[in-house]
Amino acid sequence: MMTERTFSIIKPDVVKRNLIGAILTRFEQNGFKIIASKMVRLTREQAEGFYAEHQGKEFFVPLVEYMMSSPIVVSVLEKENAVKDYRTLIGTTNPETAAEGTIRKDFALSQRENSVHGSDSIESANREIAYFFTNSEIFER
C-alpha cells in the first residue's frame, strides 16, 4: 500500500459551533496524520474558484455564500488509502442517509451544512491541496 494525501475542509457549521477539535480528533483516531492545517476566511473569488465545477447549478450561489459565512479549517491528511478512507469516515453528502458513526451523521445540520468536505479522488486531492497550500506549508511526519 502507498501512503496518500487527501484534502479536508471543516466547514462553517462546525466552526460556528466550536467543534473543530472534535473533528480533528476523529481524523487522528482513524489513523490520519494531519500534515498541514490552517484557518482561512474565503473571499468570494476563492469560494467561487474552489467550487467552479458547480457554477451554473442551482446550489452554487447558496454554497458560495455558506462557505464565506465563517472561517473554515483546511487540512492535508495522510495515510494509506487516504482518499477512500476519508470518504468513508465522513459519510454521504446528505447526513440523513449517512452511515452511523460517520462525521456527517454525527455533526452535520443539513445537506448544505454538512460539516466537512473531502476530495473524491487523488487528482482532486492534489488540485485542492495546491489551491490552499504551498509545499513549504506541508510537513512530513
Curated annotation (Swiss-Prot):
Keywords: ATP-binding, Cytoplasm, Kinase, Magnesium, Metal-binding, Nucleotide metabolism, Nucleotide-binding, Phosphoprotein, Transferase
EC annotation from Swiss-Prot or TrEMBL: 2.7.4.6
Cofactor or coenzyme needed: Mg(2+)
GO terms for MF: ATP binding; metal ion binding; nucleoside diphosphate kinase activity
Active-site residue list: 117
BP-aspect Gene Ontology terms: CTP biosynthetic process; GTP biosynthetic process; purine nucleotide metabolic process; pyrimidine nucleotide metabolic process; UTP biosynthetic process
Keyword Lipoprotein: no
Binding residues for ATP: 11, 59, 87, 93, 104, 114
Top class in the EC scheme: transferase
Xref: InterPro entries: NDK-like_dom, NDK-like_dom_sf, Nucleoside_diP_kinase, Nucleoside_diP_kinase_AS
Entry's Gene Ontology cellular component terms: cytoplasm
Keyword Cytoplasm tagged: yes
Reaction catalysis annotation: a 2'-deoxyribonucleoside 5'-diphosphate + ATP = a 2'-deoxyribonucleoside 5'-triphosphate + ADP; a ribonucleoside 5'-diphosphate + ATP = a ribonucleoside 5'-triphosphate + ADP
Listed Pfam families: NDK
Subcellular location: Cytoplasm
Quaternary state and interactors: Homotetramer.
Family: Belongs to the NDK family.
PANTHER family referenced in this protein's UniProt entry, alphabetically: NUCLEOSIDE DIPHOSPHATE KINASE, NUCLEOSIDE DIPHOSPHATE KINASE DDB_G0292928-RELATED
Function text: Major role in the synthesis of nucleoside triphosphates other than ATP. The ATP gamma phosphate is transferred to the NDP beta phosphate via a ping-pong mechanism, using a phosphorylated active-site intermediate.
Protein name, as recorded: Nucleoside diphosphate kinase
Organism: Haemophilus influenzae (strain ATCC 51907 / DSM 11121 / KW20 / Rd)
Gene name of the record: ndk
